[in-house]
Amino acid sequence: MKTLSMSLKDKFTLQNKNTALMVIDMQNDFCHLSGYNSYKLGLSLKLINKAKKKIIQLVEWSRYNKIQIIFTKESHREDLVDLTNSKRERYKNANTPIGDKGPMGRFLIRGYEGCELINEIKPFDKDLILDKTEHSCFVNTNLQNYLKEKNINNLIICGVTTQCCVLSTYRHSLDLGMDSLLIEDCCGAYDAKIHQSAINIINSEDGVLGKTLTLKELIN
């Protein structure tokens, strides 16, 4: 593929054999007009839909380049035994309790339509679909072992929401020694200022906190 600048001094080469694309939480509850966040909370999907179009292009580009694709879903068991007290209270205090009844089923509960990936994204059999209970995709999952087994040490990260699961996963990947890129226009949030603030944090400090690119910069 090609060499991309990760900081003012360091570079790394993206090669399809050791690179994976992570598409984070493109679920109906977050991205569908009848999903929990839009229908029940009244959040605008304008920025999510804009990012979705770019994400679909990025997935197609990754397939063309034979890059491993990982789709993640924030999800919980129906009995909520995998929900920590901390997360339970945080979501409850934000008036978005995990398991709350929504138009597409219980919010972020496995087996309900709202928890599933949006129809526009159709995983192939060779793709990995990863259920996770926390914001970082590495917490309480086998993701790190999976990447080691596949000899994957470069990640291209996109998805929703920028400031939450995307940023948490991106920062965690760097702490684990991965070379990771966040594709900023392939990430979405419900508020443009919050999205941009997350991007600005990553691009501050001369690359110490990571690197973002646009989709055009990546594929060109």
Roles of regions detected by a PLM:
Residues 67-74, 183:
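Short beta-strand segments at enzyme active-site cores
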Residues 77-81:
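Short catalytic/ligand-binding loop motif for oxyanion handling, primarily in non-cytosolic enzymes
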Residues 1-22, 29-30, 57, 61-65, ...:
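Active-site-adjacent betaalpha module
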Residues 17-19, 34-62, 66-68:
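A short alpha/beta connector and helix-capping loop motif
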